[in-house]
């Protein structure tokens, strides 16, 4: 007998609906749900193999207490009660001794409702040091565009869209659910332009591909703005009536040297002019940006400049152009940004989070600030913390510094599915349940909400949101966790509880027509009520009111190349390296280089290469030739570690991990706390006596 359970994949925020088939031997298999209006039954490889996470023999199933030194991977099993009691005792002692802010809380990539629960615990503990990945994922894009347009625009891609610019994004790999609309527009004649150092799916199929120097995006955006203004190609009516600061922007670009900007990108003026004309002449056009534009210190201003391009072209809130978000969410607390949670601590107090960036809306502590406080005690000491569903040993900048910082902590707790390099640095490790192991609520990409069914219990693992609440209760600062109350709060916008949602299975979001030209009646949600080409608010924060291009880190004779990174379609950041079905598809970290560079450095395909950004910053990855790359650009894999190495070198966290190469230096213009990831000056050469592990 084959039992089918319809539920939702929780590996990313897309929320693909899946059918889990269970036979009489309790063996599971996964297929996409063809009734899902977003995916139509399609599913990525990670989702197809998600059951392997739940059933993996190396899952953490009991609370663990460290017995050896940090990183030695020596533990004893303890009860949940002992774990919670010891955590509460240590956390309370830390705050009583060193102050409320000596305790930090860190979460990772979007995990529905869990990150908000951690924010609530931080609020209850009166600590401003809540940390997430936003400085290099989402915040630069969101706030850069909001400071300009008053909102973060979507893309109304349909048969009316005449031009699509893919900028630092590969939807084919990372958000395949959007490809249906993209392909529909292309079939109806849309011109496509791809801005990316490597030949992605979009670049391969584009009408124009701009393989710019990694990290030179702001130079390209400012070159396009200058061309549009110099040639008077902008939408004169929209700019005159609905934009603030055009004369200041015009004066600014008058001073720019187009040849210099083009050279910084290693693109011809002719190519930049051609694609700018294609974009500006389209009746309706969209720019789709990706995570790559969140990655460098200038990322906020990159997104400001792109929003300015959207405005100059007049593609705001028109059919087939950039769209305004609309409608209210059917759930509460899915993301840790809701005012009722954020405002529990005043903005004035939140500004004291360590490393807090100048942009006040980005109130969280930064990884750079946390590490500096752990190591120096400045501006105050960070002594203990709770890390939930993230792996800072691979995801924070300067992995060696992360280890040094964690070694200074008095007490560290990690909630995880597996023993990661970060978990090995903890004092207590708590076993987290995968999304298959608890009943709950999920939200799809279209805004619809769904009941998430539980398949089975694995050991004594618990859902992260419950773990967080139980820690808060043990500390005496949160009520006893009640599952019904938790989900009823999440479902408060639709006024039902979890059992009622289970009976309904799903509540579909209303299909609303895209708003067009709403600014005619309500303006834009900015101080001037217009699109802010010049931002007085940024000026008052002593930040650039108009985007200013500053060169990336300079190349040198020793480091003449530039390295950037890209995500694998087979993994979620550092997650999944122990899943054999995924590892078989991508067994080793890959660095892509031009064959001419390989010949120059005596490297062949399959060789292990050393990638170096400083004498003490070297990683090793397997060479693959890609002659579509510029000869001085290399693309290295992201977030690698080797679970099969166990405690040896923290599961190989320093062998191939890209963040060994990065630093906590954010330069002089990191408005939002982003650090250098794209375009690091480097060298590459053949490694000796290095073998990379594979399972």
Regions found by a protein language model. Name each.
Residues 116-183, 188-194, 202, 218-222, ...:
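Extended redox/cofactor-interaction regions of prokaryotic respiratory oxidoreductases
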Residues 1-231, 260, 268-269, 356, ...:
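N-terminal export/assembly segments and adjacent metallocofactor-ligating motifs
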Residues 21-27, 527, 613-615:
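Short acidic-glycine loop/turn motifs at beta-strand connectors
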């Amino acid at each position: 007998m084959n039992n089918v359970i319809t539920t939702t994949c929780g590996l990313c925020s897309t929320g693909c609906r899946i059918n889990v088939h269970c036979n009489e031997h309790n063996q599971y298999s996964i297929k996409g749900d063809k009734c899902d209006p977003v995916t139509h039954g399609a599913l990525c490889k990670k989702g197809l193999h998600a059951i392997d996470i739940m059933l993996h023999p190396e899952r953490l199933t009991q609370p663990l207490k460290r017995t050896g030194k940090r990183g030695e991977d020596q533990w004893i099993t303890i009860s949940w009660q002992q774990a919670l009691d010891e955590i509460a005792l240590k956390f309370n002692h830390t705050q009583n001794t060193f102050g409320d802010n000596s305790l930090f809380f860190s979460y990772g990539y979007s995990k529905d409702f869990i990150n908000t629960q951690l924010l609530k615990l931080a609020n209850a503990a009166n600590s401003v040091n809540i940390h997430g990945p936003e400085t290099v994922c989402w915040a630069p894009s969101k706030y850069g565009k909001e400071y300009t347009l008053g909102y973060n625009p979507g893309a109304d891609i349909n048969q009316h869209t005449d031009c699509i610019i893919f900028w630092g994004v590969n939807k084919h790999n990372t958000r395949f659910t959007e490809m249906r609309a993209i392909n529909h527009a292309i079939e109806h004649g849309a011109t496509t332009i791809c801005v990316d150092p490597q030949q992605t799916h979009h670049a391969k199929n584009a009408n124009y591909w701009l393989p710019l120097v990694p990290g030179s995006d702001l130079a390209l955006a400012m070159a396009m703005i200058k061309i549009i203004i110099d040639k008077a190609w902008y939408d004169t009516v929209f700019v005159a009536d609905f934009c603030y600061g055009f004369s200041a922007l015009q004066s600014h670009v008058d001073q720019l040297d187009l040849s210099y900007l083009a050279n910084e990108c290693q693109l011809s003026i002719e190519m930049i002019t051609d694609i700018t004309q294609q974009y500006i002449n389209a009746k309706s056009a969209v720019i789709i940006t990706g995570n790559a534009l969140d990655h460098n210190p200038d990322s906020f201003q990159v997104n400001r400049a792109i929003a300015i391009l959207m405005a100059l072209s007049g593609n705001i809130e028109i059919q087939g152009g950039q769209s305004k978000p609309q409608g209210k969410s059917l759930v509460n607390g899915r993301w840790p940004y809701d005012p009722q949670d954020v405002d529990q601590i005043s903005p004035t107090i939140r500004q004291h989070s360590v490393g807090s960036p100048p942009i006040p809306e980005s109130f969280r502590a930064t990884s750079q600030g946390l590490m500096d406080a752990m190591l120096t005690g400045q501006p105050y000491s960070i002594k203990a913390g709770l890390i939930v569903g993230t792996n800072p040993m691979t995801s924070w900048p300067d992995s060696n510094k992360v280890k040094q910082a964690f070694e200074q902590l008095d007490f560290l707790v990690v909630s995880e599915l597996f023993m990661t390099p970060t978990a090995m640095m903890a004092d207590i490790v708590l076993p987290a349940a995968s999304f298959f192991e608890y009943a709950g609520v999920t939200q799809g990409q279209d805004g619809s909400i769904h009941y998430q069914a539980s398949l089975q219990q694995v050991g004594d693992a618990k859902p992260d949101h419950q773990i967080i609440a139980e820690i808060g209760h043990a500390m005496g600062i949160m009520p006893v966790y009640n599952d019904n109350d938790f989900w009823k709060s999440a479902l408060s916008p639709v006024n039902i509880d979890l059992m009622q949602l289970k009976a309904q299975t799903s509540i579909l979001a209303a299909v609303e027509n895209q708003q067009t030209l709403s600014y005619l009646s309500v303006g834009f949600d900015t101080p001037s009520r217009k699109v802010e080409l010049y931002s007085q608010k940024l000026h008052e924060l002593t930040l650039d009111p108009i985007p200013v291009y500053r060169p990336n880190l300079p190349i040198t004779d020793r480091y003449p190349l530039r390295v950037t990174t890209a995500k694998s379609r087979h993994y979620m950041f550092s997650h999944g390296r122990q899943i054999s079905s995924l590892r078989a598809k991508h067994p080793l970290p890959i660095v892509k280089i031009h064959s001419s560079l390989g010949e120059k450095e005596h490297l062949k395909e399959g060789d292990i290469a050393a990638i170096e950004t400083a004498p003490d910053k070297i990683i090793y990855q397997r060479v693959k030739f890609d002659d579509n790359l510029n000869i001085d650009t290399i693309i290295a894999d992201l977030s690698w570690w080797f679970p099969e190495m166990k405690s040896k070198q923290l599961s190989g966290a320093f062998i191939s991990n890209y963040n060994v190469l990065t630093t906590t230096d954010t330069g002089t213009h990191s408005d939002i706390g982003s650090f250098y990831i794209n375009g690091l000056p480097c060298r590459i050469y053949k490694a000796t006596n290095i073998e990379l592990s594979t399972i």
